[in-house]
């Protein structure tokens, strides 16, 4: 049913009943019509004043908004045109401390409110009959509801809609929280690289170049796939097969050029990347002697790194990382020198490094092994004599046992397949130190690294891989390992000022949490009968990725 906003009275100018006893009826009708016209003109003038008053108010608010916008534009234009790029007018701290912009314009969201009720409708409402006085019964109700709302409640439908919207918003937030929890529990899937489309023209171009170049392109494609999807295990097995069967039909001379170059590149990468490989000993030979080709045998991987001889020099350069090797495991004390030599000549056990010379000999000249003539390790190799002419290439090191995987220079002979596969396994890791010794203490390491002069030093005195090796120090600086630990009472006691400061910091953190909680509760309580606020809150919950109450920022912009 439409509501009549303005009603012009009287409707009918001449439609009136003439009273009895009037002699001149025509004059009476004329006077009544003129009076009704005047009444209509008065009502029209009144409504015109209402209409123009509303227009004036709208124009005034519009002009105020336009003027404020013009002032902001003028300020921005001045700051933009006269901005000096060399001067920093706004610091980073001001940017972070400044609050977000909040509009102060009140939007007309509730059109049918008592405050926005027009004056003619208010007059019409006042003419209507009053509802029954049910508010008298409100103090006697136990549920606290108004008695008149059971008879008439203008906000019933809006309250019903608001309750439904808020419930839907809360349900969506719970659903998002459950979905996020499922995503956290689910393991992260690796990104898949899409498969390239099949191109027949490129295949024909590869075949036109030749089988060798086509194979190189295929290897390059495999490398690109390996870089994109991670290293694969089956790409590394083929070069190892060629290396393990050097004496068979898979030798380097029988391979095509593309496979040979790929094999050499991979072998060089493996040699350069290994961090625990020790540097090879410097070769000793005369001017006219033929230099042996170094072949590095690694006990940690069980592979033979080999490179073909270059036609110019007849040697193969092997690049090894200069990182120090890990120390060998300790040997039992019951082993003697003869058993050590016997175990060195046998194949199954891992090679044991030779014991270092005395400190005096080590300081005079470095221990450089002579060029080995036979294949088997002679007894003299364990205790080599330093040559008188060779200058020291490396600084003398303290009498600490060298690591087991040392690259020895031996003549290159093709090893049978059985010997290559039967290489000894890598040595086990060194045992942990006893509970009374701290591995991180350099004093204990120094005391252990220098045994008494009467005893022969053994390789078992090497520290763990995480303990740094220290040069020998004078006896006056050596502190015994049985040093008493510091008592906890010698540590500085925390003063009362520090404890008070820590307690104040904790209280400040708790107060900050309470303030944030109160702010969130105030934001929840601030939502009133505002349609735009409720809708914006629901939209923010639907399109937000986080569980925070970031949807309340939309409310600030609408206020």
UniProtKB/Swiss-Prot annotation:
GO terms for biological process: actin cytoskeleton organization; cellular response to brain-derived neurotrophic factor stimulus; lamellipodium morphogenesis; mitochondrion organization; positive regulation of Arp2/3 complex-mediated actin nucleation; receptor-mediated endocytosis. Residues 304-313 have a biased composition (Polar residues). Transmembrane segments: none annotated. It comes from Pongo abelii. Residues 170-202, 304-383, 412-490 are annotated as: Disordered. Residues 497-514 form the WH2 domain. Residues 322-332, 347-360, 423-437, 460-477 have a biased composition (Pro residues). Component of the WAVE1 complex composed of ABI2, CYFIP1 or CYFIP2, BRK1, NCKAP1 and WASF1/WAVE1. Within the complex, a heterodimer containing NCKAP1 and CYFIP1 interacts with a heterotrimer formed by WAVE1, ABI2 and BRK1. CYFIP2 binds to activated RAC1 which causes the complex to dissociate, releasing activated WASF1. The complex can also be activated by NCK1. Binds actin and the Arp2/3 complex. Interacts with BAIAP2. Interacts with SHANK3; the interaction mediates the association of SHANK3 with the WAVE1 complex. Interacts with ABI1 (via N-terminus). Residues 182-202 have a biased composition (Basic and acidic residues). The lineage of its organism: Eukaryota, Metazoa, Chordata, Craniata, Vertebrata. The modification Asymmetric dimethylarginine is found at residue 341. This is Actin-binding protein WASF1. Residues 333-346 have a biased composition (Low complexity). The modification Omega-N-methylarginine is found at residue 341. It is found in: Cytoplasm, Cytoskeleton; Synapse; Cell junction, Focal adhesion. The keyword Ribonucleoprotein does not apply. Binds the Arp2/3 complex through the C-terminal region and actin through verprolin homology (VPH) domain. InterPro entries: SCAR/WAVE_fam, WH2_dom. One of its GO terms (cellular component) is synapse. Pfam families: WH2. Downstream effector molecule involved in the transmission of signals from tyrosine kinase receptors and small GTPases to the actin cytoskeleton. Promotes formation of actin filaments. Part of the WAVE complex that regulates lamellipodia formation. The WAVE complex regulates actin filament reorganization via its interaction with the Arp2/3 complex. As component of the WAVE1 complex, required for BDNF-NTRK2 endocytic trafficking and signaling from early endosomes. Also involved in the regulation of mitochondrial dynamics. It comes from the Eukaryota. Belongs to the SCAR/WAVE family.
